[in-house]
Amino acid sequence: MLTIGCHLSISDGYEAMGKTALSIGVNTFAFFTRNPRGGSVRQLDLDDVAALRSLMAEHSFGPLVAHAPYTYNPCSAKERAREFALEAMGEDLRRMEALPGNYYNFHPGAHVGQGVERGIELIADTLCQVMFEGQRTCVLLETMAGKGTEVGSRFEELAAIIDAVCARRPELDECLGVCLDTCHVSDAGYDIVHDLDGVLDEFDRVVGASRLRAVHINDSKNPCGAHKDRHEVIGAGCLGSAELGGGEDVFARIVSHPHLRDLPFILETPNELAGYAREIELLRGLQTD
């Protein structure tokens, strides 16, 4: 069965997220580690976390995909912003140890005029500091749309970050991966509508297929190469709409592709719970053997 879910609110706690997930028939989900705009985080309730872990085991959940707030910019030109990212990411990863075996996804950041190479250097340096030997959480760099000075819209940039971390901290190799966002990769110029195989072959050649650990499955309001990053409901955008994109076959190929089909899929579309349930039913019906 397709491992699929959506973003859920952590406001009522961990077990509540699990129960909400079950109510809409999903077997994974994503959540922000703290307010998506950043800030403080409430004390971890270990009993609540244990209740979620029990629920996940009982109902055969796949890995969860925790998401770092958007405010983190580990390659900012401002030292204070980099320090904030360093402190908060470190705290997030320590807290994630209460939920072992799951994923921590983050946006690599924007170099804001320093240049891509400097951005890569700063991101790798942050990861080398916040990650630790023996950690039980895999850190995922998200593929980006290339808006402004974002780092990570090209596969080569993601590979360079991972290579830089592993060169300094080889013991972290197994704890680094990539989350492929279907809206972002299309907006970045990778034509997954007409050449999904070619795009994934390129990823395999540049980064390595084994680094793919999760998928943010979203339609896009904009055509390939727009560098906009505006998500759309599945089937209503430039990927899955018959009028604007390639129709449902595009998402059928995505959820059925041998490099992707067994990964956790997370919806980040502009929807509510009932809408997510409909999208999930659609995508499960599109997966073929």
Question: Where do the protein language model's features map onto the residues?
Answer:
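Active-site acidic/histidine proton-transfer and metal-coordination neighborhood
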Residues: 58, 74-177
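Conserved, mostly hydrophobic/aromatic
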Residues: 21, 67, 96, 104, ...
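N-terminal pre-domain/capping segments
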Residues: 1-68, 72, 76-93, 289
